[in-house]
């Protein structure tokens, strides 16, 4: 994950909040189903990214930092998304490929779950194209595709499909190398359960 973010979140953990060796520094990304933080690993003296499962429309943050359901009717959907989030962390942690986001560990706390990932430089393809559309030429894309195909082959060889290959889920590092970010499994699982799959699966990017 990368440090490109300019917004704020009232639901986010505060700077300085700690999980064992990890200390939250700031929010660097946010979507409808998760918040990504830049954090400092005090044991290994490095920065990492931590993603928190937090479907904002279903939960609120209590004073003790736990997530609280806004309504009991969200229980089944929230738990299904949580299970998918944890399974995705386990799956991604199996791979060590420069084109796939590197998950270092995960855990459950605050009635939700977290995954620790490598912190990547650069920005998403979506942001890059919005900021410098002239950079994303056919020649540039052709150069970017081989390492992306290699990452996909690694997944396919192990029987996995990445169904969220979209510009906002593809990190372009400072050296130009692409990194496929998370599968968005929790988002998809919740989409299935709420009959909004056509929205959650990003038409044009997911089968």
Where would I find each of the regions flagged by the language model?
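Activation-segment/catalytic-loop signature of the eukaryotic protein kinase fold
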Residues: 106
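AlphaC helix of the eukaryotic protein kinase fold
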Residues: 63-94
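Conserved short submotifs of the Hanks-type protein kinase catalytic core
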Residues: 110-124
């Amino acid at each position: 994950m990368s440090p490109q973010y300019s917004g704020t979140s009232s639901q986010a953990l505060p700077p300085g909040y700690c999980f064992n060796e990890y200390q939250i520094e700031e929010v660097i990304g946010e979507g409808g189903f998760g918040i990504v933080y830049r954090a400092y690993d005090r044991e290994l003296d490095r920065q990492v990214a931590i993603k928190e499962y937090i479907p904002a429309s279903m939960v609120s943050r209590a004073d003790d930092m736990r997530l609280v359901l806004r309504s009991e009717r969200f229980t089944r959907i929230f738990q299904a998304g949580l299970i998918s989030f944890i399974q995705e962390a386990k799956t991604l942690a199996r791979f060590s490929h420069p084109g796939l986001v590197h998950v270092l560990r995960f855990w459950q706390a605050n009635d939700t779950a977290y995954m620790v990932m490598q912190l990547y430089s650069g920005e998403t393809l979506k942001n890059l194209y919005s900021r410098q559309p002239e950079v994303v030429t056919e020649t540039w894309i052709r150069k970017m595709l081989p390492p992306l195909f290699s990452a996909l082959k690694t997944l396919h060889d192990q029987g996995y499909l990445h169904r969220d290959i979209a510009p906002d889920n593809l990190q372009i590092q400072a050296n130009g190398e692409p990194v496929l970010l998370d599968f968005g499994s929790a988002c998809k699982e919740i989409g299935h359960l709420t009959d909004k799959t056509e929205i959650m699966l990003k038409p044009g990017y997911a089968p």
